[in-house]
């Protein structure tokens, strides 16, 4: 990683995202851009531009002062960007202008609604497909050692696997595929075993076709069930540090941008989650075998 963008509203909800972004930048020797947008407060009936000039300047100065205080002693190359306006528009514009390797942010609110927990900023970045987004929820206890990537064998899932491998080269990667259990007449146990073996083979073929470095070891896991349930269960049992998913796919639950599997995973998992959109200029990988 050479460039990381932290999207923050300077609230306590983004403190963990700040700590993670600083750690990632320091470990990779990357430049960290910290961006915040001064939006109109719901409690303030006056537009920011209509405020007296000294109040406008105070908000800018206070925000910069807070960020500089937070950066003190962090030993990281950082750039601060503070603008008036909508956060989503600012982050998307910065991402397009600078081609960041990773965009880091925190959760918006702890409610049961997808839009509220992630916020419009994350939605805007995913919708415009300007880069992978790391949603930080946990306290920083060290680098990411283990990463679980959910796959439906789509190009979006492939993008998630590539991103996890490129961004975190030292982490152990596990790819999990949730398949539909065998149905219909016949020997159920035999059919289940056949479905399991077929899913494992498809998973291995998918990994090979992604064409990661030859030295990169990938573990494949397949199980019948719902993707979000299995991903969360495996992540808990295997003590996974980070989940990674693509935001488009061919699976019925991943078929739309920010589909229900992706939403349910972010909502229900306490773990940090890497959301990877398929970038507009990506082309499908060649088949292997």
Say what each PLM segment does.
Residues 1-50, 146-189, 212-215, 268, ...:
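Small/aliphatic-rich secondary-structure junction motif
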Residues 20, 39, 50-55, 69-103, ...:
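Structural beta-alpha unit
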Residues 33-35, 79-83, 134, 174-176, ...:
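General small-molecule cofactor/ligand-binding pocket signal
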Residues 44-46, 116, 160, 185-188, ...:
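Short, well-ordered secondary-structure micro-motifs
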Residues 51-63, 191-201:
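A short acidic, glycine-rich active-site loop
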Residues 102-124, 143-144, 242-268, 278, ...:
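Glycine-rich, Arg-bearing micro-motifs that act as flexible, cationic patches
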Residues 107, 125-126, 134-163, 180-216, ...:
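Conserved N-terminal glycine/acidic-rich loop preference
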Residues 124-138, 268-277:
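Short, acidic/small-residue loops that bind anionic groups at enzyme active sites
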């Amino acid at each position: 990683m050479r460039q990381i963008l932290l999207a923050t509203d300077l609230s306590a909800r983004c403190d963990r995202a700040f700590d993670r972004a600083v750690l990632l930048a320091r470990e990779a020797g990357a430049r960290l851009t910290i961006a915040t947008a001064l939006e109109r407060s719901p409690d303030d009936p006056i537009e920011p531009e209509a405020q007296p000039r000294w109040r406008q300047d105070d908000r800018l100065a206070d925000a910069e002062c807070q960020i500089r205080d937070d950066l003190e002693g962090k030993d990281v190359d950082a750039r601060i960007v503070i603008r008036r306006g909508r956060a989503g528009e600012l982050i998307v514009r910065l991402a397009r202008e600078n081609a960041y390797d990773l965009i880091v942010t925190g959760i918006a609110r702890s409610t049961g609604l997808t839009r509220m927990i992630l916020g419009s900023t994350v939605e805007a970045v995913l919708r415009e497909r300007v880069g992978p987004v790391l949603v930080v929820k946990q306290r920083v206890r060290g680098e990411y050692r283990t990463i679980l990537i959910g796959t439906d064998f789509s190009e979006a899932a492939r993008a998630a696997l590539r991103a996890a491998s490129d961004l975190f080269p030292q982490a152990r990667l596990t790819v999990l595929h949730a398949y539909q259990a065998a149905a219909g007449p016949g020997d159920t146990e035999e059919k289940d075993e056949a479905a399991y073996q077929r899913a494992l083979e498809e998973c291995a073929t998918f990994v090979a076709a992604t064409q990661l470095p030859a030295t990169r070891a990938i573990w494949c896991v397949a199980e019948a069930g719902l993707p979000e349930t299995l991903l969360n269960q495996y992540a808990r049992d295997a003590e996974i540090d980070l989940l990674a998913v693509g935001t488009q796919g061919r699976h019925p639950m991943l078929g739309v941008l920010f589909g229900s599997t992706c939403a349910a995973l972010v909502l229900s998992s306490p773990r940090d989650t890497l959301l990877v959109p398929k970038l507009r200029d990506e082309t499908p990988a060649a088949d292997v075998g």
